[in-house]
């Protein structure tokens, strides 16, 4: 039978509810075991693989081998560094029951743990609070090694697509604004200027009887040329 060493300090919130305090270490004959509901195949000798944002459920089974009744009143825990055993973060205390367990009997309850830590290797050490012999006692459970990683984001994730659309719209707006302020003026200033050809027109006073009509592609006035020069000579073909 496994005997656990009890920690001396009790949580203030739980002590207030029950009305007892502990001053020194105690020894009790209580067996506590748990398994991970989502991955029951993971044992204490394995390394669990967790992702930030997931919720892990621990199902506890407690066997009371004491001669008196014990009452489970809460559960907490901590993530520690498996190499240095330093505490990295504490879990939020959760109320249980109170769940009374008579001598020689067992009981079960569950604890939900939200995973939100810096990606790394950890050891999860749950702790169960219970009342025994008019004292609040804490039993640290076995540790569970775990590797925590960030959740991978898919390229087709709606949140990522929305962010991409917002960025594209922002870049398009900035580009359009820059064109209106600087680009448009720059293009107008550097574009080649097309020169239009003009034809000189000679003005003639009205009433002079002079016509300035030109013909075809000759480009000269035919009114002053004698008619004889304008007629084409006809030649007869002699047989």
From Swiss-Prot:
It is a single-pass type I membrane protein. The keyword Transmembrane helix applies. Residues 20-160 are lumenal. Residues 182-239 are cytoplasmic. Pfam families: TRAP_alpha. The chain crosses the membrane at residues 161-181. Keywords: Endoplasmic reticulum, Membrane, Signal, Transmembrane, Transmembrane helix. Residues 1-19 form the signal peptide. InterPro entries: TRAP_alpha. It is found in: Endoplasmic reticulum membrane. One of its GO terms (cellular component) is endoplasmic reticulum membrane. PANTHER family: TRANSLOCON-ASSOCIATED PROTEIN SUBUNIT ALPHA, TRANSLOCON-ASSOCIATED PROTEIN, ALPHA SUBUNIT. Belongs to the IRC22 family. Is probably involved in a pathway contributing to genomic integrity. This is Increased recombination centers protein 22. It comes from Lodderomyces elongisporus (strain ATCC 11503 / CBS 2605 / JCM 1781 / NBRC 1676 / NRRL YB-4239).
């Amino acid at each position: 039978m496994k005997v656990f060493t009890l920690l001396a300090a009790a949580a203030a919130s739980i002590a207030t509810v029950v009305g007892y305090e502990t001053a020194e270490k105690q020894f009790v004959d209580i067996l506590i075991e748990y398994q991970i509901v989502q991955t029951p195949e993971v044992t204490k000798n394995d390394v669990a693989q967790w992702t930030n944002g997931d919720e892990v459920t621990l199902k506890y089974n407690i066997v009371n081998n004491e001669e008196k009744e014990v009452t489970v009143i809460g559960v907490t825990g901590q993530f520690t560094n498996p190499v240095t055993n330093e505490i990295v973060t504490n879990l939020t205390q959760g109320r249980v029951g109170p769940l009374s367990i008579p001598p020689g009997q067992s009981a079960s309850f569950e604890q939900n743990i939200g995973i939100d830590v810096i990606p790394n290797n950890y050891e999860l050490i749950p702790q169960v609070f219970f009342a025994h012999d008019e004292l609040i006692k804490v039993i640290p459970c076995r540790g569970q090694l775990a590797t925590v990683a960030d959740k991978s984001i898919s390229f087709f994730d709606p949140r990522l697509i929305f962010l991409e659309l917002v960025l594209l719209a922002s870049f398009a707006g900035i580009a359009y604004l820059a064109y209106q302020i600087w680009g448009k003026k720059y293009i107008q200033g550097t574009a080649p200027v097309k020169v239009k050809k003009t034809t000189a027109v000679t003005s003639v006073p009205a009433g002079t009887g002079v016509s300035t009509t030109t013909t075809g592609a000759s480009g000269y006035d035919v009114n002053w040329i004698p008619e004889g020069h304008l007629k084409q000579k006809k030649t007869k073909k002699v047989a």
